[in-house]
């Protein structure tokens, strides 16, 4: 995949145009693991190119599970805001059909994570500190690096580019990224904020 911006990248990244896969469906792919259509493949490619142009893929010093990542807020504050609003208005109501007691409190963070043979190739097993977590495959021209949930015996191998894989963040769904074998993998990680009473 080229990292040179395409002509429509600015419209997609800054204006959130042609970004949304508006198909409304929620599919259970494992115990308490759901897939929801989210972005178009064109939006995924535009976000990859924008992240590469920013060029700030680095682990956060205080992160106990550091990854080579760049926040959407760093790429574009308006992109972060559009994603936060889209998830709250379009995706969260679908999630409430399976988890009726969840409250939307915005995003803790949303970031692009990169796996490459010359840097980070995998991520150790862990669970997140969020209300709900999600992941989007931004590309599929690589081998390995599946997001794996050992307790549920589920991976994201068959989740389409642009779809959101969603799960409860704490305790029950430890996950890891398996070793990358070839290519470069880009993913989008979403951490939904915990309700205030739990912070």
Please tell me what each predicted stretch does.
Residues 6, 10-104:
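Non-heme Fe(II)/2-oxoglutarate
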Residues 89-199:
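Catalytic core of non-heme Fe(II) oxygenases with the double-stranded beta-helix
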């Amino acid at each position: 995949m080229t990292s040179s911006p395409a002509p429509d990248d600015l419209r997609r990244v800054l204006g959130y145009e042609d970004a949304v896969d508006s198909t409304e469906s929620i599919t259970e792919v494992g115990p308490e693991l759901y897939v929801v259509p989210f972005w178009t493949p064109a939006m995924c490619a535009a976000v990859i190119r924008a992240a590469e142009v920013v060029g700030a893929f680095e682990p956060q010093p205080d992160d106990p599970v550091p990854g080579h990542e760049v926040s959407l807020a760093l790429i574009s504050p308006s992109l972060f805001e559009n994603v936060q609003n889209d998830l709250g208005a379009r995706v969260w109501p679908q999630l409430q059909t399976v988890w009726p007691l969840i409250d939307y409190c915005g995003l803790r963070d949303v970031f692009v994570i990169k796996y490459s043979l010359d840097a980070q190739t995998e991520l150790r097993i862990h669970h997140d500190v969020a209300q709900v977590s999600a992941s989007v495959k931004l590309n599929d021209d690589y081998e390995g690096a599946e997001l794996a949930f050992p307790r549920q015996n589920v991976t994201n191998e068959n989740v389409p580019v642009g779809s959101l894989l969603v799960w409860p963040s704490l305790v029950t769904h430890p996950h890891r990224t398996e070793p990358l074998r070839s290519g470069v993998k880009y993913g989008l990680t979403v951490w939904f904020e915990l309700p205030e009473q739990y912070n």
